[in-house]
Protein backbone atom coordinates (compact mmCIF):
# COMPACT_ATOMS: atom_id res chain seq x y z
CA UNK A 1 0.00 0.00 0.00
CA UNK A 2 1.32 3.45 -0.85
CA UNK A 3 2.08 6.07 1.79
CA UNK A 4 -0.89 8.12 0.53
CA UNK A 5 -3.17 5.13 1.05
CA UNK A 6 -1.82 4.57 4.55
CA UNK A 7 -2.38 8.24 5.43
CA UNK A 8 -5.94 8.05 4.12
CA UNK A 9 -6.59 4.90 6.16
CA UNK A 10 -5.11 6.51 9.27
CA UNK A 11 -7.25 9.61 8.75
CA UNK A 12 -10.42 7.55 8.33
CA UNK A 13 -9.70 5.48 11.43
CA UNK A 14 -9.05 8.63 13.45
CA UNK A 15 -12.30 10.20 12.25
CA UNK A 16 -14.22 7.02 13.06
CA UNK A 17 -12.78 6.97 16.60
CA UNK A 18 -13.74 10.60 17.22
CA UNK A 19 -17.29 10.18 15.90
CA UNK A 20 -18.03 6.87 17.62
CA UNK A 21 -20.13 7.41 20.78
CA UNK A 22 -19.07 6.08 24.17
CA UNK A 23 -19.87 2.37 24.39
CA UNK A 24 -20.71 0.53 27.59
CA UNK A 25 -17.25 -1.08 27.62
CA UNK A 26 -15.63 2.39 27.51
CA UNK A 27 -18.03 3.91 30.04
CA UNK A 28 -16.59 4.42 33.55
CA UNK A 29 -17.95 1.94 36.10
CA UNK A 30 -19.40 4.73 38.24
CA UNK A 31 -21.90 5.50 35.46
CA UNK A 32 -23.71 2.30 36.50
CA UNK A 33 -24.20 3.52 40.10
CA UNK A 34 -27.68 4.70 41.13
CA UNK A 35 -28.41 8.36 41.79
CA UNK A 36 -27.65 9.09 45.44
CA UNK A 37 -28.69 12.37 47.06
CA UNK A 38 -26.32 11.77 50.01
CA UNK A 39 -27.08 12.58 53.65
CA UNK A 40 -26.97 16.39 53.36
CA UNK A 41 -30.04 18.39 52.39
CA UNK A 42 -28.81 21.48 50.53
CA UNK A 43 -30.61 20.51 47.30
CA UNK A 44 -28.51 21.10 44.17
CA UNK A 45 -30.10 20.26 40.80
CA UNK A 46 -27.72 17.66 39.31
CA UNK A 47 -27.66 14.93 36.66
CA UNK A 48 -26.90 11.21 36.74
CA UNK A 49 -26.63 8.56 34.05
CA UNK A 50 -29.48 6.05 34.10
CA UNK A 51 -28.14 2.85 32.45
CA UNK A 52 -31.64 1.36 32.03
CA UNK A 53 -32.89 4.37 30.06
CA UNK A 54 -29.44 4.97 28.52
CA UNK A 55 -29.62 8.71 29.17
CA UNK A 56 -28.81 11.38 31.73
CA UNK A 57 -31.62 12.43 34.05
CA UNK A 58 -31.99 15.21 36.58
CA UNK A 59 -32.08 14.57 40.34
CA UNK A 60 -31.58 16.63 43.49
CA UNK A 61 -28.16 16.20 45.11
CA UNK A 62 -27.99 16.97 48.82
CA UNK A 63 -24.52 18.49 48.64
CA UNK A 64 -22.28 15.88 50.28
CA UNK A 65 -21.23 12.25 49.82
CA UNK A 66 -23.53 10.41 47.40
CA UNK A 67 -22.12 8.46 44.45
CA UNK A 68 -19.68 9.44 41.70
CA UNK A 69 -22.57 9.24 39.20
CA UNK A 70 -23.29 12.92 39.80
CA UNK A 71 -22.76 15.76 37.33
CA UNK A 72 -23.36 19.51 37.48
CA UNK A 73 -24.54 19.69 33.86
CA UNK A 74 -26.37 17.32 31.55
CA UNK A 75 -23.65 17.90 28.95
CA UNK A 76 -20.93 16.72 31.36
CA UNK A 77 -22.99 13.61 32.16
CA UNK A 78 -23.57 12.84 28.49
CA UNK A 79 -19.94 13.31 27.48
CA UNK A 80 -18.80 11.00 30.30
CA UNK A 81 -21.45 8.29 30.33
CA UNK A 82 -24.05 8.46 27.55
CA UNK A 83 -23.76 6.23 24.51
Swiss-Prot record:
Entry's localization field: Secreted
Keywords, alphabetical: Disulfide bond, Protease inhibitor, Secreted, Serine protease inhibitor, Signal
Main location: secreted
Signal peptide boundaries: 1-24
GO cellular component assignments: extracellular space
Cysteine pairs bridged by disulfides in the record: 31-81, 40-64, 56-77
Domain called BPTI/Kunitz inhibitor: residue spans: 31-81
CDD domains given in the database record: Kunitz_textilinin-like
Residues flagged as site, Reactive bond for trypsin: 41-42
GO molecular function per UniProt: serine-type endopeptidase inhibitor activity
Domain of life: Eukaryota
Family annotation (InterPro entries): Kunitz_BPTI (IPR002223), Kunitz_BPTI_sf (IPR036880), Prtase_inh_Kunz-CS (IPR020901), TFPI/VKTCI-like (IPR050098)
Tissues where the protein occurs: Expressed by the venom gland.
PANTHER family: KUNITZ-TYPE PROTEASE INHIBITOR-RELATED (PTHR10083), SERINE PEPTIDASE INHIBITOR, KUNITZ TYPE, 3 (PTHR10083:SF376)
Family: Belongs to the venom Kunitz-type family.
The protein's role, per its UniProt record: Serine protease inhibitor.
Protein name: Kunitz-type serine protease inhibitor scutellin-1
Source organism of the structure: Oxyuranus scutellatus scutellatus
Amino acid sequence: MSSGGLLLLLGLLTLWEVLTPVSSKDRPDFCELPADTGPCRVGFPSFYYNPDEKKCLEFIYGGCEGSANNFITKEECESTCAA
